[in-house]
Amino acid sequence: MSKYRGPRLRLVRKLGKLPGLTSKISKKTNTPGEHGQPQNKLLKNRSPYGLRLLEKQKLRFNYNITERQLLRYVKQAKNLTGSTGEILLAILEMRLDNIVYRLGMAPTIVAARQLVSHGHILVNKQKVNIPSYPCQLKEVISVKDKKASRDLVKKFVQESAVNPVPSHLSFNKENLVGIVNNVATREWIGLQINELLVIEYYSRN
């Protein structure tokens, strides 16, 4: 299944806030469709399977990844020691496109993906154009030393100044340089998600 390229606010109305996909908030409170209902009412009427599916979709669309990618990350998380749900979230948070977004270099994960794909971002002074690249501890994230690249990222940094940089990262706004100091923790996810239901979804399918 490919990445979503449709109306973003339509997804927000259906799934709730998706900060990685869009910072906009829909003025409409009902879910999409002719017979749309308030989200709270819809949640009460959902079956256990429907709730698991909803959480899975929230995670996939927020991080803008394909079904195949998410399944691969779930399998990876299951093979590691610890809480599978929290490990899954940490894996997603350590993707390069998400790190760029968390540093404030881009307003959304979607925009961060574009920066990475177009070669604007460096990891340890080397160009990395793979959004899914898994960042490691102490890696340095910076911007290509070209005026167009730096001007673009500076603009994004100014726009995202109200959002704090997570505690596992550090960022120098003047030099546009970030460092991965630690693994992402649950408290900085910024998405209302029940990751255990996501794990259950794949365990039952």
From Swiss-Prot:
InterPro entries: Ribosomal_uS4, Ribosomal_uS4_bac-type, Ribosomal_uS4_CS, Ribosomal_uS4_N, S4_RNA-bd, S4_RNA-bd_sf
Region of interest called Disordered, as start-end residue ranges on this chain: 22-42
GO molecular function: rRNA binding; structural constituent of ribosome
Gene Ontology biological-process entries: ribosomal small subunit biogenesis; translation
Ranges for domain S4 RNA-binding: 94-157
Main localization category: plastid
Biased composition (Polar residues): 28-42
Function: One of the primary rRNA binding proteins, it binds directly to 16S rRNA where it nucleates assembly of the body of the 30S subunit.
Family statement drawn from the similarity comment of this UniProt entry: Belongs to the universal ribosomal protein uS4 family.
Name of the protein in question: Small ribosomal subunit protein uS4c
Organism in which the protein naturally occurs: Tupiella akineta
Source lineage: Eukaryota, Viridiplantae, Chlorophyta, Ulvophyceae, OUU clade
Gene behind this protein: rps4
